[in-house]
Swiss-Prot record:
Residues 3-116 form the Response regulatory domain. GO terms for biological process: regulation of DNA-templated transcription. SMART domains: REC (SM00448), Trans_reg_C (SM00862). Keywords: Activator, Cytoplasm, DNA-binding, Phosphoprotein, Transcription, Transcription regulation, Two-component regulatory system, Virulence. The modification 4-aspartylphosphate is found at residue 52. It comes from Staphylococcus saprophyticus subsp. saprophyticus (strain ATCC 15305 / DSM 20229 / NCIMB 8711 / NCTC 7292 / S-41). InterPro entries: CheY-like_superfamily, OmpR/PhoB-type_DNA-bd, Sig_transdc_resp-reg_receiver, WalR-like, WH-like_DNA-bd_sf. It is found in: Cytoplasm. Residues 124-222 bind DNA. Gene3D superfamilies: 3.40.50.2300, Winged helix-like DNA-binding domain superfamily/Winged helix DNA-binding domain (1.10.10.10). This is Heme response regulator HssR.
Length: 224
């Protein structure tokens, strides 16, 4: 799943942008400051960053420079400042695109996809493993002879595992990616969803299985 980091000190912008992008089947990570964003990136990877210019101690210009030089992440800047000098500064710091507020989030989505295409980031809504094809737009899994629609969280969980075959994910990583970093429920919800997915996979195609790696987490294997 394509991951988009959104950095803005306005909670309304964070909610507005993240909700729309998630409907396009992207994973979103929201941070309210440049410092928090950099702390997150010390242990996580993202595919693109949407960065507001005017923030607290560290400006969006400074953050963009670091993201480009140290992390090589595509960046789109958001700002209410539309002076030519501001645009020049943004591009000099390395931004890939520049969007002025107020903006249509649909247009922002077009720009995100265009930038990702230039970086050859796969934003395909389908992934195949074994004899199965997972279609993210319809929350559907298909084999050669059967198809099945899954509940959203179950599908996203399977899609993540299938997109990274044989990679082991622990519960914390799965919860953060599927339920969000602010999830406060029982971590055993992962086990419940995995159990349901195993039963569904048995019905549609036994060649794809979810394995428990004792003490580590879960991974998907295919036996084709």
């Amino acid at each position: 799943m394509t991951t988009c980091l959104i950095v803005d000190d306005d909670p309304k912008i964070l909610e507005y942008v993240s909700k729309y992008i998630e409907r396009e089947h992207f994973e979103t990570i929201v941070q309210s400051s440049a410092e928090n964003a950099l702390s997150y990136l010390e242990t996580h990877q993202v595919d693109i960053a949407i960065v507001d210019v005017m923030m607290g101690k560290m400006s969006g210009f400074e953050l963009c420079k670091i993201l480009k030089e140290d992390f090589d992440i595509p960046v789109i800047m958001l700002t209410a400042r539309d002076a030519l000098s501001d645009k020049e500064q943004a591009y000099l710091t390395g931004t890939d695109d520049y969007v002025t507020k107020p903006f249509e989030v649909k247009e922002l989505m077009f720009r995100i996809k265009a930038v990702l295409k230039r970086y050859n980031v796969n934003i395909n809504n389908e992934v195949s493993i074994g004899n199965l094809t997972l279609n993210q737009s319809y929350l559907e899994i298909q084999s050669s002879s059967k198809s099945m629609n899954l509940p959203n969280k179950e599908f996203q969980l399977l899609f993540l595992l299938a997109s990274n075959p044989r990679q082991v994910f622990n519960r914390d990583a799965l919860i953060e990616k599927i339920w969000g970093f602010d999830y406060e429920g029982d971590e055993r919800t992962v086990d419940v969803h995995i159990k349901r997915l195993r039963k569904r996979l048995e019905k549609i195609d036994a060649s794809v299985t979810i394995h428990t790696v004792r003490g580590l987490g879960y991974k998907v294997d295919d036996h084709v």
